[in-house]
Swiss-Prot record:
Name of the protein: GPI alpha-1,6-mannosyltransferase 2
UniProt gene name: PIGV
Lumenal compartment residues: 35-77, 135-136, 183-192, 256-327, 401-470
Residues that span the membrane, as ranges: 14-34, 78-98, 114-134, 137-157, 162-182, 193-213, 235-255, 328-348, 380-400, 471-491
Function, in words: Alpha-1,6-mannosyltransferase that catalyzes the transfer of the second mannose, via an alpha-1,6 bond, from a dolichol-phosphate-mannose (Dol-P-Man) to the alpha-D-Man-(1->4)-alpha-D-GlcN-(1->6)-(1-radyl,2-acyl-sn-glycero-3-phospho)-2-acyl-inositol intermediate to generate an alpha-D-Man-(1->6)-alpha-D-Man-(1->4)-alpha-D-GlcN-(1->6)-(1-radyl,2-acyl-sn-glycero-3-phospho)-2-acyl-inositol and participates in the seventh step of the glycosylphosphatidylinositol-anchor biosynthesis.
Known pathway: Glycolipid biosynthesis; glycosylphosphatidylinositol-anchor biosynthesis
Length: 494
């Protein structure tokens, strides 16, 4: 059982409140706003529904839009269609485990209704745990409890809010990734590697996280390097690097092999319900046991690359079309945030960035850069490289509107840097003592003015906030609410 300090309790309280409000608003929007008829994956319902199922659909149906339908379909029927393999198995497996806990209700609810309830409960849990874990990670990396607290509170109002609540894998991925980062900061590389591997089983961009393990191992190598006998540590480093890569990439490799067995090996056909076969015929989906797809004959038969290319038209600069300008505008705020963060950090620590943060420990006595707490801490370097790499790849090779949920569920930088700006440029947060570890308890003196929730303090005093604070909170709150309004009704917010 965790022992939570006052700041962690406040993060937990605010995260739970935001999750409850999110579920209530998505239900309201789902009921009062008619769904847009989008050209999205919509498999037929095989089981009959009763009045209780219709109630669940009305209350939680907003969580099943767009890609969530794929995850729900996979959890219910498995990987029947080729394009289902764009969605990794970690989250569907979690949904299946959630439905097992709901087994007593399965006589009352259909399988789909149980899955919807599982989505709501599990992503509620994962999002709250991710917020608490981000706070813990911030304390370890930033060395500034105040910024760690602000960042965790901002995560509760994430621009990717709807994707942390809906039937998407972002909440689970964020929890696993932040947990892995925290374990690595504590020096527990094996636990970190296992968590990063689990994250890779949830989302493909978990593969990039191997960079954290590689950087930590290289940093340790250079800090303890013995010039007279470097070969033994070098061989040990190479073995450790290879093991890290294998560990983190293993779930991806196993998933690709499973796809190969389903589509490329004889005798892999399964019994598929007729309505789902008809859907494949009508939509042109390739189904297991059908004709062998072209990727089976590749030297490295990766179904994931094929699907992204053929089904989603993902590739270098393919999204750079005039009609995609609105999607580029949607992704602009988070892109500006990361670029601004990178520029601020690089101009503060040019030498640290040039040496890739791999200075030997004995050099630390030299004033290569001033020690900074908070976002400008030398420890943040590898996190910033990770965020910048995701931004660069996402901007050039992905559907650019995905950048918001990609970055907001993968990197703490999009929360640390706004927290840094709030601390340094918001007078309201400097006017009273709001250091998280000194947050008031119920028995605090009545004359004390320090607020329990810094975000609510800023919202209550919106007109007195600085322009930077208004931009940050305006962006977070607008996307938090607008995403719910649009996504839950099949409107274009993906």
């Amino acid at each position: 059982m965790w022992s939570l300090d006052p700041s962690q309790k406040e993060v937990l309280r605010f995260a739970v409140s935001c999750r409850i409000l999110t579920l209530m608003l998505q239900a309201l929007f789902n009921i009062i706003i008619p769904d847009h008829h989008a050209d999205a994956f919509s498999p037929p319902r095989l089981a009959s529904s009763c009045s209780v199922d219709q109630l669940v659909e009305g209350l939680l149906g907003g969580l099943s839009r767009w890609d969530a339908e794929h995850f729900l379909f996979i959890a219910e029927h498995g990987y029947l269609y080729e394009h289902n393999f764009a969605f990794f198995p970690g989250f569907p497996l979690a949904l299946l485990m959630g439905t097992e806990l709901l087994r007593p209700l399965q006589g009352l609810l259909s399988q789909r209704s149980c899955l919807l309830v599982s989505v709501a409960l599990l992503n509620f849990l994962f999002s709250v745990l991710a917020a608490v874990t981000l706070h813990d990670l911030g304390c370890l990396v930033l060395g500034c409890p105040r910024q760690a607290f602000y960042a965790a509170m901002l995560f509760c109002l994430s621009p990717a809010n709807v994707f942390l609540a809906a039937g998407y894998s972002e909440a689970l991925f964020a929890f696993l990734t932040f947990s892995a980062m925290g374990q690595l900061e504590r020096g527990r590389s094996w636990a970190s590697g296992l968590l990063f591997a689990l994250a890779t089983g949830v989302r493909s961009n978990g593969l990039v996280s191997v960079g954290f393990l590689l950087h930590a191992q290289c940093r340790g190598f250079f800090s303890s390097l013995v010039v007279l006998n470097p070969l033994k540590p070098l061989f040990k480093l190479m073995a450790s690097l290879c093991l890290s890569v294998l560990t983190v990439s293993l779930p991806f490799a196993l998933f690709q092999y499973y796809a190969y067995t389903q589509f490329c090996l004889p005798g892999s056909a399964h019994s598929v319900p007729e309505p789902l076969v008809q859907l494949a015929v009508d939509k042109g989906y390739r189904i297991t046991g059908g004709n062998e797809p072209p990727w089976c004959s590749w030297g490295l038969p990766l179904v994931y690359s094929y699907i992204q290319d053929v089904y989603w038209n993902v590739g270098f600069l393919r999204y750079y079309e005039l009609r995609q300008v609105p999607n580029f505008l949607l992704a602009t705020p988070v892109a500006v945030l990361v670029v601004w963060a990178a520029w601020t950090y690089v101009t503060t620590h040019p030498w640290l960035c040039l040496t890739l943060g791999l200075r030997r420990s004995k050099d630390s006595k030299k004033t290569l850069e001033k020690p900074h707490p908070g976002f400008l801490s030398p420890k943040v370097f590898v996190y910033l490289v990770h965020a910048a790499g995701l931004l660069l790849f996402g901007s050039l090779c992905m559907h650019v509107q995905v950048l918001t949920r990609l970055l907001c569920s993968s990197t703490p930088v999009v929360y640390w840097f706004p927290a840094h700006l709030l601390q340094n440029q918001e007078p309201l947060l400097r006017s009273v003592d709001t250091v998280p570890e000194k947050l008031l308890e119920k028995n605090s003196p009545p004359g004390q003015k320090a607020p329990r929730n810094c975000i609510m303090k800023l919202l209550y005093n919106w007109r007195a906030c600085s322009p930077v604070t208004r931009c940050i909170l305006g962006y977070f709150l607008t996307y938090w609410l607008l995403g719910l309004l649009l996504h839950c009704n099949f409107l274009p917010w993906t």
